[in-house]
């Protein structure tokens, strides 16, 4: 929910609600001018999304009514993944920031010609006719997920809202896909719902999808793209790091994915 006012006015209600609903974690997004208020109420800053509020940073604070939820069980592994990402050459991402990318729209035939995908692969925006196959792929890829991507109707509904879906096909069969949840008011977009089938991983599909989403977002005058990705998954973290995204924090036990709650890394990039 959105709240305008002093955080202390709502902190008690949030704590009571968490107790009633047996919530293990309370998450608060706040602009820079309000960032000290959650701290005075016992909240801890876990990360930042750069330029989230139409150019202003967003500070993410958390409180853990359930103390066990605060424990990161794979911290050492996740720290190693980030260390490896930051150690690798990020020159490509830096160069991309310096370049003035044309905002002119081109057709998808031209984009296909410039694609780095191997022969037989096609990258394109998803359409309504893809929803059934997309839902099936998501249901196979995630045992648990924060949103019902396994439902065709849900995907169709989000297609009509502020969600862009892009996919990679191999001879007409979807092998990789991702989306961008757009916030037009604040001109930010979250790149999410990233999935590649096991036999196609490591071939660079996700990087191409991210690039395509970024291009579309830039053409729509969005300021920033960011992601909250699984902290224990090396591939997806490496993909965002190699594209010039900055690591800006980790949200502990934040999302139900796979077998339970997982830590999520924050990566941000100006468009």
UniProtKB/Swiss-Prot annotation:
Residues 121-269 form the N-acetyltransferase domain. It comes from the Archaea. PROSITE patterns: GNAT. GO terms for molecular function: N-acetyltransferase activity. Residues 95-114 have a biased composition (Basic residues). It comes from Methanosarcina mazei (strain ATCC BAA-159 / DSM 3647 / Goe1 / Go1 / JCM 11833 / OCM 88) (Methanosarcina frisia). Keywords: Acyltransferase, Transferase. SUPFAM superfamilies: Acyl-CoA N-acyltransferases (Nat) (SSF55729). Catalyzes the acetylation of beta-lysine to N6-acetyl-beta-lysine, a compatible solute produced by methanogenic archaea that helps cells to cope with salt stress. This is Beta-lysine N(6)-acetyltransferase. It catalyses: (3S)-3,6-diaminohexanoate + acetyl-CoA = (3S)-6-acetamido-3-aminohexanoate + CoA + H(+). Induction: Transcription is induced at high salt concentrations. Forms part of an operon with ablA. The keyword Transferase applies. Its EC number is 2.3.1.264. Residues 86-122 are annotated as: Disordered. NCBIfam families: GNAT_ablB. Belongs to the acetyltransferase family. It is an enzyme of class 2 (transferase). The keyword Metal-binding does not apply. Pfam families: Acetyltransf_1.
């Amino acid at each position: 929910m959105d709240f305008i006012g002093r955080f202390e006015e709502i902190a008690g209600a949030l704590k009571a609600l968490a107790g009633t609903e047996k919530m293990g974690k309370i998450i608060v997004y706040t602009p820079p001018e309000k960032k000290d208020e959650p701290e005075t109420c016992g909240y801890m800053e876990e990360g930042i999304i750069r330029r989230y509020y139409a150019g202003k940073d967003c500070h993410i604070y958390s409180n853990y009514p359930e103390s066990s939820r605060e424990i990161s069980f794979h911290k050492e592994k996740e720290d190693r993944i980030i260390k490896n990402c930051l150690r690798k050459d990020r020159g490509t991402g830096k160069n991309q920031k310096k370049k003035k990318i044309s905002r002119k729209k081109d057709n998808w035939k031209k984009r296909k010609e410039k694609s780095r995908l191997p022969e037989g692969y096609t990258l394109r925006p998803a359409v309504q006719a893809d929803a059934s196959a997309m839902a099936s792929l998501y249901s196979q890829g995630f045992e648990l997920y924060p949103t019902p991507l396994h439902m065709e109707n849900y995907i169709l509904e989000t297609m009509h809202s502020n969600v862009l879906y892009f996919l990679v096909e191999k001879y007409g069969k979807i092998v990789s896909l991702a989306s961008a949840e757009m916030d037009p008011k604040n001109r930010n977009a979250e790149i999410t719902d990233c999935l590649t089938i096991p036999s196609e991983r490591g071939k660079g599909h996700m990087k191409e999808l991210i690039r395509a989403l970024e291009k579309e977002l830039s053409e729509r005058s969005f300021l920033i793209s960011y992601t909250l990705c699984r902290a224990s998954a090396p591939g997806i973290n490496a993909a965002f790091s190699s594209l010039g995204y900055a690591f800006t924090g980790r949200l502990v036990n934040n999302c139900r994915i796979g077998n339970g709650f997982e830590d999520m890394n924050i990566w941000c990039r100006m468009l």
